[in-house]
Amino acid sequence: MSVTADLTGAQAKAATLIEALPWLARFAGSCVVVKYGGNAMADPELRREFAADMVFLRYAGLKPVVVHGGGPQISVMLDRLGIDSEFRGGLRVTTPEVMDVVRMVLLGQVGRELVGLINAHGPFAMGLSGEDGGLFTAVRRQAYVDGQPVDIGQVGDVESADISAVTHLLEAGRIPVLSTVAPDADGVPHNLNADTAAAALAIALRARKLVVLTDVPGLYANWPDRSSLVSEVTADELAKLLPSLESGMVPKMEACLRAVRGGVPAAHVVDGRVAHSVLLEIFTSEGFGTMVTPG
């Protein structure tokens, strides 16, 4: 390779860094909550790249907090153990036996692996769950099938949050990695929806952004029409769109809506199948995915 080619490549890298400068200045010291899931969690290379992105945010002066689910991994483990599992109203029926597996997979497998990948770059990540330090108190969630209530067991929503454990970690320069298991008022553990938990945490932390990783490029106003991708939408506009959305996008967009209506300045849905999608959203002028604003 010629010296000229080397210089051109170096200049291109420098231009990319300079493009990020205003965003580095804008978000320095800000908390960003990232909901980690989908293919970004399933693909080994994307897992490593996501971990590196979180470390980059930390070195860039931001305060990332990761909230993860683990539905596919839970299903694999249940099958391996020969435990029957079913879904009602789009939610996994969580018996006490299933709850034991949920806790084992989220805390002992998914969370631990992500902590390890982040800490390959330095001693930054600390794993915790909604059970630690009274972080979350859950309330049992009601599901409906054909308009009728059904019992789905130990599945919960966030009733309240005590963020002191997370803020202490952030003040110490750590990257909290949160597994979505939390007790109710009676101490019974519940499996929380990770999108809902991420939104609740973003509100409680007064985060600058909520970023939700998905397996699609963003919100489509008229799925599967690929030309209907929405780059920006207000809370009121999103509320009108929700009833018509594809079922898999509803909890993610509801989380974004809840976050911005709860005081988070912006929430984003980005394609986790694209390497470094979180960085593309935060540090480029074009942004990435769909942004939800208060309006």
From Swiss-Prot:
Catalysed reaction equations from the record: N-acetyl-L-glutamate + ATP = N-acetyl-L-glutamyl 5-phosphate + ADP
- A single Pfam family it belongs to is AA_kinase
Predominant subcellular localization, coarse grouping: cytoplasm
Top-rank taxon of the source lineage equals Bacteria
Site Transition state stabilizer: give positions.
Answer: 35, 252
Name the record gives this protein: Acetylglutamate kinase
| One record GO biological process | arginine biosynthetic process via ornithine
* Originating organism: Salinispora tropica (strain ATCC BAA-916 / DSM 44818 / JCM 13857 / NBRC 105044 / CNB-440)
Query: Transmembrane segments in this chain: where?
Result: none
Magnesium as a keyword? no
Q: What is its EC number?
A: 2.7.2.8
Quick one: which gene encodes this?
Answer: argB
- Free-text function comment from the UniProt entry: Catalyzes the ATP-dependent phosphorylation of N-acetyl-L-glutamate.
**One MF annotation (Gene Ontology) recorded for this entry:** ATP binding
Q: Which residues bind substrate?
A: 70-71, 92, 191
Q: Which UniProt keywords apply?
A: Amino-acid biosynthesis, Arginine biosynthesis, ATP-binding, Cytoplasm, Kinase, Nucleotide-binding, Transferase
Cross-referenced InterPro entries: AceGlu_kinase-like_sf, AcgluKinase_fam, ArgB, Asp/Glu/Uridylate_kinase, Glu/AcGlu_kinase, NAGK-C
Q: Which SUPFAM superfamilies match?
A: Carbamate kinase-like
Task: Please state which protein family the record places this protein in.
Answer: Belongs to the acetylglutamate kinase family. ArgB subfamily.
Which Gene3D superfamilies does this one have?
A: Acetylglutamate kinase-like (3.40.1160.10)
Among the entry's GO cellular component annotations, what is one?
cytoplasm
Where is the protein localized? Cytoplasm
Pathway as given in its UniProt record: Amino-acid biosynthesis; L-arginine biosynthesis; N(2)-acetyl-L-ornithine from L-glutamate: step 2/4
